[in-house]
Amino acid sequence: MNLREAEEKDFETIYMMGYDAWGDGLSKSDYLLTCKSSIKYKNGKWYVLENDDKVLLSSLLIHNLNHLNCGTGLEIRGIGSISTPIYLRKQGYGSNLIVRTMSYINRDIPIDIWFLYSDIGADFYHKLKFEPLPSNFQKRTSSLLMAYCRPNTWNINTNVPQIEIPNYF
């Protein structure tokens, strides 16, 4: 398996990985148009996990959220749009992609706080050491805000860093 940044030729496949979850009743062509025009999708950096035959197994989007650090100097990133094709789910590809991407990015810039909004509950991400933020930090009822913090950066349950909590991304 190989981790790499997504290329232009990958985007239709990437977008369709999430059609069942985020299609909201749109036709496939309308859904693709929505994805292609999404500011959120254009502002982040896409990563994919592919097999040795170059088949895309999973994808995710990394957002630089340093604008939330309120001058603390903390490096903050968001992980979003994590998706795997239906027929490849429950085989560990999403977890593998998350771990590899975080490790890859941390080689160049040690990230202090990784945020994500879970649309699938906490269990999947808890296995990857993400913790749900306390209820007073939650900004959505339909998605759970979770964080993975570098040691000694932020104990989610005991203190509050001087940062802004991200809206859904």
Where do the PLM segments sit?
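Conserved beta-strand in the GNAT
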Residues: 48, 54-67, 76-83
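A short, internal acetyl-CoA/4′-phosphopantetheine-binding micro-motif in the GNAT/acyltransferase core
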Residues: 79-90, 120
